[in-house]
Design a protein with these regions (language model features):
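Active-site glycine-centered loops adjacent to acidic/histidine catalytic or metal-binding residues
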Residues: 30, 61-62, 91-92, 165, ...
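Short, solvent-exposed loop/turn segments at secondary-structure junctions
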Residues: 67, 169-175
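Short acidic, glycine-rich surface-loop motifs adjacent to enzyme active sites
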Residues: 154-171
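Extended active-site neighborhood of metal-dependent phosphoesterases/phosphodiesterases
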Residues: 17, 69-159, 178-193, 203-239, ...
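N-terminal active-site segment of His-dependent metallophosphoesterases
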Residues: 7-74
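Acidic, His/Gly-rich catalytic cores of divalent-metal-dependent hydrolytic chemistry
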Residues: 240-255
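Residue-level marker for buried hydrophobic side chains located in beta-strands
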Residues: 25-27, 57-59, 88, 162, ...
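Cleavable N-terminal signal peptides
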Residues: 3, 13-14, 143
Length: 255
């Protein structure tokens, strides 16, 4: 059921003292809920995730397929079964109409641009969407301003994880046009990992000390863009200032 894809961080920022504790967390993307059958699938996913005992979960967007309030609420209910904190960011499909994210804001308040800390690590969740657009997008001025205002408040020496919906890896399909403007703001920080969605497929790219990844989708009624069939999520371990991760495949439910 598990297929391994371990990767070590390559470098550590000079002079940084890694946190002493280690912990695990899950990363899931592109669940695209659009019917009750998707709810049964997502509950199955959550039960498999519970076996891995992560301390929290990151969902990097496209929770639902068409931004409906009732679908977002259903995803919230399914994810609550994990019994652990779930931190999400908005995907383009989580908008109801081109620029309307009101349903997402109502169901998941304060989940646009934000930070949290865990085990000596810093986590930054960002909105990289351009409304409903899926290609040739730009990261909003509002997000870039938020980064400018809040990134200096973080400890540049402590390890940091960035999670956001649109793929930021160099050359990955649907990468926002102004990704470099965002990444340049993180160059002086101890960024160790970047988790993205939107492109349904496994990609891995370097950025300074970090590895930037996308993953296969974890949706019942959506496929992968890279032609693969596997659905699943990452289980990640933060230890000694580095991140490792492995892919947990979710098999189809019995007929």
């Amino acid at each position: 059921m598990l297929s391994l894809g371990l990767w070590p961080g390559v470098l550590r920022t000079a002079g940084a003292t890694p946190p002493s504790a280690s912990f695990t967390f899950a990363v899931i993307n592109d669940t695209h809920y659009l019917s009750p059958e998707c709810g049964a699938w997502l509950k199955h996913v959550v039960q498999l995730m519970k076996i891995e005992a992560p301390e929290f979960c990151l969902h990097v967007g496209d929770l639902v397929d068409n931004g409906q309030h009732e679908h977002l609420a259903a995803v919230r209910e399914c994810l609550a079964d994990l019994g652990k904190p779930v931190h999400m960011v908005i995907g383009n499909h989580d908008h109801r109409i081109p620029r309307d994210r009101s349903a997402y804001d109502a169901v998941f308040p304060d989940s646009i641009n934000y930070t949290f800390n865990h085990g000596g690590w810093q986590f930054v969740g960002l909105d990289s969407t351009d409304g409903l657009l899926f290609d040739r997008t730009t990261i909003s001025d509002a997000t870039l301003r938020w980064v400018d205002e809040n990134l200096p408040r973080l400890d540049s020496m402590k390890p940091l994880v960035l999670f956001t919906h649109c793929p930021l890896g160099e050359g990955v399909q649907h990468r926002p046009l102004n990704t470099d403007a965002l990444f340049n703001r993180f160059r002086d920080h101890n960024l160790q990992a970047v988790f993205n969605g939107h492109f349904h497929g496994y990609t891995e790219r370097p950025f300074v000390h970090a590895t930037v990844t996308t993953n296969r989708c974890c949706a019942l009624k959506r496929g992968n863009h890279d032609g693969t069939n596997e659905k699943g999520f990452f289980i990640c371990t933060a230890s000694d200032g580095l991140i490792t991760r492995r892919f947990v495949e979710v098999k189809p439910l019995p007929a």
